[in-house]
Regions:
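Short, cysteine/histidine-rich loop/knuckle motifs that typically chelate Zn2+
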Residues: 32
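P-loop/Walker A phosphate-binding loop and immediately adjacent motor/lid segment at beta-alpha junctions
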Residues: 195-233
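Long, intrinsically disordered low-complexity tandem-repeat segments
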Residues: 115-158
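Conserved Radical SAM active-site core
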Residues: 1, 35-121, 157-166
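Structural recognition of alpha->loop->beta junctions
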Residues: 116, 163-193
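Short pre-active-site segment immediately N-terminal to redox-active cysteine/selenocysteine motifs
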Residues: 25-29
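N-terminal [4Fe-4S]-dependent radical SAM core
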Residues: 1-22, 35-42, 222-223, 227
Length: 233
């Protein structure tokens, strides 16, 4: 995996002072994207153990609230494979720090039992990451368990997220659920230039959602984070 930038003392991409990692590689190509150079999977520098250590060192500061991963697209299958062992380490070493991920994919795409699965492929010329999902965690498969009923995930009525049902995309892989279990907040949805709103917190456009990952996984439905709304809204 490559990354385009690391920001320390970032206050724009999540609650509190944060360290932010901008990974490379994105297939969304949103109109109005603020950093289209990160669409290229080979943009920037390789994300190595040295970069991991720099981020870990920054999180040891008491005033740093947590880590945010954005891009680019962290939830491209190639990036999920590289991020899983890193975020597992961060969660183990810093259990009191929050982890946020920004993705153009939808929660429904990442979690629906009936969604297609794609195998992560390393970028050409890069080494494959041999990390394994957490012991005891479920492997994410495209097919439901034998005897279970396959259901179609439905977006909220009237929600612009219905693009999920019309143009299903390939983002779910063996790393997806193990990775989601490590994070606190998922900001989902592509940037929509027509819905751009500079007044909202931690989002570029109104279609995007701040999802409480732990509550959503526990309930089996999207639970919006309290951070979704600005004060007084």
């Amino acid at each position: 995996m490559y990354y385009g930038n690391m920001k320390y003392n970032d206050i724009a991409n999540g609650i509190g002072v944060r360290t932010s990692l901008f990974v490379s590689g994105c297939r969304h190509h949103c109109k109005g994207c603020f950093q289209p150079q990160t669409w290229d999977f080979d943009y920037g520098k390789p994300f190595t153990k040295e970069e991991e250590e720099k981020i870990a060192a920054s999180l040891r500061e008491d005033y740093v609230a947590g880590l945010t991963v954005l891009g680019g697209e962290p939830m491209e299958a190639e990036n999920q494979e590289a991020l899983y062992p890193f975020l597992k380490r961060i969660r183990q070493e810093f259990p009191d720090k929050s982890i946020w991920i920004y993705t153009g994919y939808l929660w429904e795409e990442l979690t629906a039992e009936g969604s297609e699965s794609v195998e992560a492929q390393p970028a050409e010329g890069s080494e494959s990451v041999e990390a394994q999902p957490e012991e005891g965690s479920e492997s994410v498969k495209a097919q439901p368990e034998e005897g279970s009923v396959q259901t179609e995930a439905q977006p909220a009525e009237g929600n612009s997220q219905r693009i999920f049902l019309e143009h299903r995309r390939y983002c779910r892989c063996r790393w997806t659920l193990p990775l989601l279990r490590l994070i606190d907040i998922l900001v989902d949805g592509e940037f929509h230039e027509a819905e751009k709103d500079l007044s909202i917190r931690f989002r570029g456009s109104r279609n995007q959602r701040l999802i409480d990952v732990k509550e959503s996984l526990a309930r089996g439905e999207v639970v919006l984070s309290e951070f979704m709304y600005k004060e007084g809204e």
